[in-house]
């Protein structure tokens, strides 16, 4: 048996292909030059463990270079065109997420676990806060919960006080508006009553003037009657007509109506009262 080191560019041994760049030590086993069976030579390949790790390192270095290039390009774009900031940020996030997914797939294929690239500082802060909360003892957590509940209770009380004050203000405004409305209605009623009273006074004054003129005409006619008929007997003072009494009666009726019915005149029945007054005088 002789061991001979041989280098192959592309050699298939037991169905496996060695890498293009790497050189492996191959031991060729021959049992003898004068072998009768003529069996082909058996190859044994010694695998190298450094090859997959070198590939993974190269891929990770390429990813880091791509990230640095994309970040530098984004900074240049932001300096040149600040209005495209949102678009660039969104694009950078999508690129990072795609690269992260590619790294995960590579790790699954190669059987190695790679560290994930953090997307932003906010995620790191959130994770740190969660770690701090988990590290805090239970007593501190309970104290913080009690403080939060107390703050919520004070906020609820303050909001309730504000609502009650607003309700009180609305009620007071409604009461004031109702009082003003009632005063306006009362003033309107008083004005209507005054107008009705003025109308009744005018009508009564006209009626009084008509009665006075009628009395004067009747007195003049009575004075002219004995002169026109000399044969007629003179009228004694006992038989004189009681025009004064009639006038007094009408005046008394007017004063009585003025004291009793005049005060009862209200809006809506003025015409009826005037008709009653005219019927009573006539």
Curated annotation (Swiss-Prot):
Positions of modified residues (Phosphoserine): 72, 225, 229, 232
Cell location: Cytoplasm, Cytoskeleton
Residue numbers carrying Phosphothreonine: 236
Acidic residues bias locations: 176-199
An example molecular function term from Gene Ontology annotations: actin filament binding
Transmembrane segments annotated in the record for this chain: none
Summary of the function given for this chain in its UniProt record: Plays a role in cytoskeletal rearrangements during the late wrapping and/or compaction phases of myelinogenesis as well as in maintenance and stability of myelin sheath in the adult. May play an important role in late-stage oligodendroglia maturation, myelin/Ranvier node formation during CNS development, and in the maintenance and plasticity of related structures in the mature CNS.
Subunit and interaction comment: Binds actin.
Protein name: Ermin
